[in-house]
Amino acid sequence: MRIPLIAGNWKMYKTVGEATTLVRDLLAGLGELSDREAIVCPPFTALAAVAALVADSPLGLGAQNLYPEAQGAFTGEVSPPMLVDIGCRYVIIGHSERRQYFGESDAFVNRKLRAALAHGLRPIVCVGESKPQRDAGQAEPIVTAQVRAALLEVPPDQMANVVIAYEPIWAIGTGDTATPADAQAMHAAIRATLAELYGSEIAATVRIQYGGSVKPDNIDELMAQPDIDGALVGGASLQAASFLRIIHYQ
């Protein structure tokens, strides 16, 4: 059984004070989570403060990025062991904003994913197509190629720790959302690709999230789709009321 994962990606928002206020509000309304997981991914500067608040709570902690070396002269970067040490269990890998603004290639995303796994972190690896690619009918081959590249040399026994997030680039922060049917079709294509790579039994265990303008008013229909196993939430995770409604989808 795939346990749904709702993850809040706070991007470059929230000071330490703002982050702790938000987490306290989330914890106050969270309750017990018996059939789903929820995590927040604050900016690096707030990780320690948030880690202290969520310890021994149902709310988990993730990071938004890492550098694929354990240590070294890499000014400005953060390593997998540093994230583990601070209390992270998850890390977002290859978000479209990293690919677009910082030139991260499929090969570099693969390095990051394997580094995360090697240090006991669970990567949330992001894939998705642009609007021109979708309009040209290339969405599925683009996305499945990203999946194959991200998972290069990842052994079958590690796939239980991998989460894939399908985020159509044209839907991120725009208010546009893929229809539940379109999202389901892409999730099914991703799962079929996983079956080609690892067999249907392993493919059936991998969680595939949807991301891209996830909101309280569309989460229920998205989560009703058979291959959608959670959500990677941006703007709607920055307010307690909206994120709690998403976490408590019906």
From Swiss-Prot:
The record lists the organism as Chloroflexus aurantiacus (strain ATCC 29366 / DSM 635 / J-10-fl)
Q: Where in the cell is it found?
A: Cytoplasm
| Keyword tags | Cytoplasm, Gluconeogenesis, Glycolysis, Isomerase
EC top class named in words: isomerase
Entry's Gene3D superfamilies?
Aldolase class I (3.20.20.70)
Its pathway is: Carbohydrate biosynthesis; gluconeogenesis; Carbohydrate degradation; glycolysis; D-glyceraldehyde 3-phosphate from glycerone phosphate: step 1/1
One Pfam family recorded for the sequence: TIM
**Which protein are we looking at?**
Triosephosphate isomerase
Entry GO MF terms: triose-phosphate isomerase activity
Reaction catalysis annotation: D-glyceraldehyde 3-phosphate = dihydroxyacetone phosphate
Q: How does it assemble?
A: Homodimer.
Q: Where does substrate bind?
A: 9-11, 173, 213, 234-235
GO CC annotations on file: cytosol
Tell me yes or no: is DNA damage among this UniProt entry's keywords: no
The UniProt similarity line reads: Belongs to the triosephosphate isomerase family.
Its EC number is 5.3.1.1
Q: Name one GO biological process term.
A: glyceraldehyde-3-phosphate biosynthetic process
- Provide the active-site residues from the annotation: 95 (electrophile), 167 (proton acceptor)
Organismal lineage: Bacteria, Bacillati, Chloroflexota, Chloroflexia, Chloroflexales
**Its biological purpose:** Involved in the gluconeogenesis. Catalyzes stereospecifically the conversion of dihydroxyacetone phosphate (DHAP) to D-glyceraldehyde-3-phosphate (G3P).
